[in-house]
C-alpha cells in the first residue's frame, strides 16, 4: 500500500466539484439558486452549446462586496448558515458554500457584482485560481459567466451527453424553477435566441400557461388544501388526461424542487382507481411544511430530501389529491347544460335498471336500435339530453346544449358497478344463490390453500365452494346477479379472483375482487344496446356523478364542446 498523503487543494476542489457539478445544468442550478437567495426579481439565464461553451446568469439581487465575492470562491464560504442548528432549519436554496468554488475549479469564470452602496467588483478565475481582480461599474446585482466547462477535466467532458440532451436538461430546470418562483421574472436565452420570459406577476397559472402547450393547460385541475402546518397547492391532470408511462411530475417542498418517492406514491394513492396501472399523472405540486421537518442535507445536489413525519405527509398529500379529483367530478357534471325547448322521449314500459344493466348475457340484441313507431306513451330522458345513438357497438353519443359526449359503455358501466358493489359490500347487501349445476374448477394445492385461507372474505362477496378432490373445487353459490351467467363466464371470473388471491394486503385484495366482479358484470364492448338501455346508462352516469374513469383508470367519457367543433370546421 502506498503512503497516505493529504491531497493538494486543487485536486480536492476537483473531487468536490464532481459531487456538486455533474453537468452543465448543475452549474445553472447552483447559480440560479444563489440569485434567488440574493433576493433577485429578474434573472436571465443564457447558455451556448448545451452549456459547454458558455453559461451566463444575470440577476438584480443584493450583490456582493469585493471581500464577499473573493470569499465565495472558496469552499464552505457561505452567508446562509452559521451554526449546526441552522442545518436543521434551512430556508435558503443554497447553504453549503460549495457552488461557486466548485464551478470555478473546473471552468473559466468571470464574476461581476455590486451592492447598493459599494463599488462593483470584477474577478476572473481559471481552474480555481484567481487571475484578475478589478473594479466594475455596473448596476446592483450579479453577473456570472462560466466558459469552457470541464476544460481541465477532459474525462468529465467526455462523459457528457449530446448537446440536445444537455440543452433539454437546462431548459427543463429553468422551467421548474420559474414555476416555483412566479414572482420572479425569468428569461432563458438558448444559443442566442430567446426561449421564454415569464412576467414575474406572482401567478403560477400564468407561468404554467406560458411554459406548457394548450392541451396540458386545459386539462389541469387546481389543487389546494391546508391542514395544520401543512399546505399543498398546484395543478394535477384531470382523470384520464395527460397520463404517461414515464413520471411527469414537478414536486416542490418549501419551494425546493425535489424528487421524493413518498410524494409520488401519495399522488398515485390519491388517483386510486382513476389511473391505469403503470401510468403516471401530470402533476405540479407545492408542499409547504415546517422547515425543521425536512432534511435537505441528504445529498450534495440537494434534490433528495427526507421527511421527519413520512406517514403524515403521505396521508395529507393523498387526501388532497382525492378531494381535488372528487371536486372535478362534481364540477364536470354540474357544468352540463340540458337542451332547451326540446323534450326527448322514450318508451314508458321499460325494464328496471337492474334488468337492463346487470347482466351482459341479456345484451345479445339482434334487432336494430330503432324504437317502435306505434307506441304512444313516452317518458322524458331525466338529464335533458338527446341520445344520438351508438357507434362501433361500444360508444354512445349524447348531445346537450353546448356539448357532445362520447361514452364508452363498458368502462362507464364498469365504474357504476364498481361503486355499487363497494357500497353493497360495506352494507352487507351482497346475496348469493345456489347455481343449478355446480361448477368444477381446477386449482393447484397452493391456490386451494390460499382460497381456504381467505374463505371468510370470499363469502362476503357471496361466493361459496367445497373441495372436490385434491386439485379441484366445486363452486356451489355465486352472487345473485351472476346467476344468469353461463358457466364459462363464472369460471373466468373466479380464475381472475384466484390470480389475485396471493395479495397480502386484504384491503387491496378486496378492491381487486370488486374490480373483477364489476368488469365481468358490466355491459360488454360489442353489445348492441336499444335506446332504453342507453337512456338508463346515461341517467345513471349523470345523476350519480360517478368518477370519470373506469376502476382501472381508463376514461369513459370524452367531452367535445360546440366551440371546439366550430373551430375545427373554421366557423369561428
Swiss-Prot record:
Gene3D superfamilies, sorted: 3.30.230.10, Histidine kinase-like ATPase, C-terminal domain (3.30.565.10), MutL, C-terminal domain, dimerisation subdomain (3.30.1540.20), MutL, C-terminal domain, regulatory subdomain (3.30.1370.100)
Molecular function as annotated in GO: ATP binding; ATP hydrolysis activity; ATP-dependent DNA damage sensor activity; mismatched DNA binding
Keywords, alphabetical: DNA damage, DNA repair
Disulfide bond residue pairs: none
GO terms (BP aspect): mismatch repair
Keyword field contains DNA damage: yes
Keyword Metal-binding: no
InterPro entries reported for this sequence: DNA_mismatch_repair_CS (IPR014762), DNA_mismatch_repair_MutL (IPR020667), DNA_mismatch_S5_2-like (IPR013507), HATPase_C_sf (IPR036890), MutL/Mlh/PMS (IPR002099), MutL/Mlh/Pms-like (IPR038973), MutL_C (IPR014790), MutL_C_dimsub (IPR042120)
GO cellular component terms given for this protein: mismatch repair complex
Coiled coil: none
Function noted in UniProt: This protein is involved in the repair of mismatches in DNA. It is required for dam-dependent methyl-directed DNA mismatch repair. May act as a 'molecular matchmaker', a protein that promotes the formation of a stable complex between two or more DNA-binding proteins in an ATP-dependent manner without itself being part of a final effector complex.
Entry similarity comment: Belongs to the DNA mismatch repair MutL/HexB family.
Cited PANTHER family: DNA MISMATCH REPAIR PROTEIN MLH, PMS, MUTL (PTHR10073), DNA MISMATCH REPAIR PROTEIN MLH1 (PTHR10073:SF12)
Family matches, as HAMAP family: DNA_mis_repair (MF_00149)
Protein's name according to its UniProt entry: DNA mismatch repair protein MutL
Species, as recorded: Dictyoglomus turgidum (strain DSM 6724 / Z-1310)
Gene: mutL
Amino acid at each position: 500500500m502506498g503512503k497516505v498523503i493529504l491531497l493538494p487543494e486543487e485536486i480536492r476542489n476537483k473531487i468536490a466539484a464532481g459531487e456538486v457539478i455533474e453537468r452543465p445544468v448543475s452549474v445553472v442550478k447552483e447559480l440560479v439558486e444563489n440569485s434567488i437567495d440574493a433576493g433577485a426579481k429578474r434573472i436571465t439565464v443564457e447558455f451556448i452549446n448545451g452549456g459547454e461553451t458558455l453559461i451566463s446568469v444575470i440577476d438584480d439581487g443584493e450583490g456582493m462586496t469585493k471581500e464577499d465575492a473573493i470569499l465565495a470562491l472558496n469552499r464552505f464560504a457561505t452567508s446562509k448558515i452559521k451554526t449546526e442548528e441552522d442545518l436543521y432549519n434551512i430556508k435558503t436554496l443554497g447553504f453549503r458554500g460549495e457552488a461557486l468554488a466548485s464551478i470555478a475549479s473546473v471552468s473559466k469564470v468571470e464574476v461581476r457584482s455590486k451592492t447598493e452602496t459599494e463599488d462593483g467588483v470584477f474577478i476572473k478565475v481559471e481552474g480555481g485560481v484567481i487571475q484578475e481582480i478589478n473594479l466594475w461599474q455596473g448596476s446592483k446585482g450579479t453577473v456570472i459567466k462560466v466558459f469552457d466547462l470541464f476544460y481541465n477535466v477532459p474525462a468529465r467532458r467526455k462523459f457528457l451527453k449530446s448537446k440536445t440532451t444537455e440543452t433539454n436538461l437546462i431548459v427543463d430546470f429553468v422551467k421548474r424553477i420559474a414555476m416555483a418562483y412566479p414572482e420572479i421574472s425569468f428569461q432563458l436565452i438558448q444559443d442566442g435566441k430567446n426561449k421564454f420570459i415569464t412576467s414575474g406577476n406572482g401567478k403560477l397559472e400564468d407561468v404554467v400557461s406560458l411554459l406548457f402547450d394548450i392541451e396540458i393547460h386545459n386539462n389541469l385541475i387546481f389543487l389546494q388544501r391546508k391542514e395544520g402546518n401543512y399546505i399543498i397547492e398546484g395543478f394535477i391532470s384531470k382523470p384520464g388526461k395527460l397520463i404517461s408511462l414515464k413520471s411527469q411530475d414537478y414536486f416542490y417542498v418549501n419551494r425546493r424542487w425535489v424528487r421524493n418517492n413518498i410524494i409520488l406514491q401519495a399522488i398515485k394513492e390519491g388517483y386510486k382507481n382513476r389511473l391505469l396501472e403503470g401510468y403516471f399523472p401530470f402533476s405540479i405540486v407545492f408542499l409547504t411544511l415546517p422547515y425543521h421537518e425536512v432534511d435537505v442535507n441528504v445529498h450534495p445536489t440537494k434534490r433528495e430530501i427526507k421527511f421527519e413525519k413520512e406517514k403524515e405527509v403521505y396521508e395529507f398529500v393523498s387526501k388532497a389529491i382525492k378531494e381535488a379529483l372528487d371536486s372535478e367530478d362534481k364540477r364536470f357534471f354540474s357544468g352540463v347544460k340540458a337542451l332547451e325547448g326540446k323534450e326527448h322521449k322514450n318508451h314508458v314500459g321499460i325494464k328496471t335498471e337492474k334488468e337492463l344493466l346487470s347482466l351482459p348475457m341479456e345484451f345479445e340484441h339482434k334487432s336494430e336500435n330503432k324504437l317502435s313507431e306505434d307506441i304512444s306513451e313516452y317518458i322524458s330522458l331525466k338529464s335533458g339530453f338527446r341520445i344520438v345513438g351508438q357507434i362501433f357497438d361500444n360508444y354512445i353519443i349524447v348531445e346537450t346544449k353546448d356539448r357532445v359526449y362520447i361514452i364508452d359503455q363498458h368502462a362507464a358501466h364498469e365504474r357504476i358497478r364498481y361503486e355499487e358493489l363497494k357500497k353493497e359490500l360495506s352494507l352487507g347487501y351482497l346475496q348469493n344463490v345456489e347455481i343449478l349445476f355446480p361448477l368444477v374448477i381446477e386449482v393447484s394445492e397452493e391456490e386451494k390453500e390460499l382460497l381456504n385461507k381467505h374463505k371468510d372474505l370470499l363469502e362476503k362477496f357471496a361466493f361459496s365452494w367445497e373441495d372436490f378432490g385434491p386439485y379441484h373445487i366445486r363452486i356451489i353459490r355465486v352472487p345473485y346477479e351472476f346467476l344468469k351467467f353461463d358457466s364459462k363466464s363464472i369460471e373466468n371470473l373466479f380464475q381472475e379472483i384466484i390470480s389475485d388471491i396471493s395479495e397480502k394486503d386484504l384491503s387491496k385484495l378486496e378492491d381487486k375482487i370488486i374490480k373483477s366482479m364489476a368488469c365481468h358484470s358490466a355491459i360488454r364492448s360489442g353489445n348492441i344496446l336499444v335506446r332504453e338501455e342507453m337512456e338508463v346508462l346515461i341517467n345513471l352516469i349523470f345523476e350519480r356523478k360517478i368518477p370519470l374513469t373506469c376502476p382501472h383508470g381508463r376514461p369513459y367519457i370524452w367531452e367535445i364542446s360546440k366551440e371546439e367543433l366550430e373551430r375545427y370546421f373554421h366557423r369561428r
